Amino acid sequence: MDANLWLWVGQILLALAFLSVAYGHALGFEAWSVRPGFGWMTAVGRNNMRVIGGLELLGSVGLILPAVTGVLLWLTPVAATCLAVLMALSVIFHARRHGEGASIVLNLILGLIAILVAYGRFVVAPL
């Protein structure tokens, strides 16, 4: 398979992953913060979680919409880069808290995929 196809797979996986949590982070603070494994949300705070959820939503849209519409194609690798930075910051946050290893692993995986998509769309197979 060619690089373009693999990059699309990465873009779609990232978009789905971030879309699946963006709503809960942005608007479902009360419901999500009491779930097991999501206690960290109270440490971040409601307003900060809204910002994070909004960034996740924008990143998800930025991974797919420019390529589908053919407009502002440079936004796709920029969105992937921004999501990679968000995941790096998330890893740092969770590393400072005890017992959140699963969050660290997930954020590392998503961050790695985002880095690969960013590099791929900037260098290997630009849109």
Task: Give a label for each model feature.
Residues 1-127:
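Membrane-interface extramembranous regions
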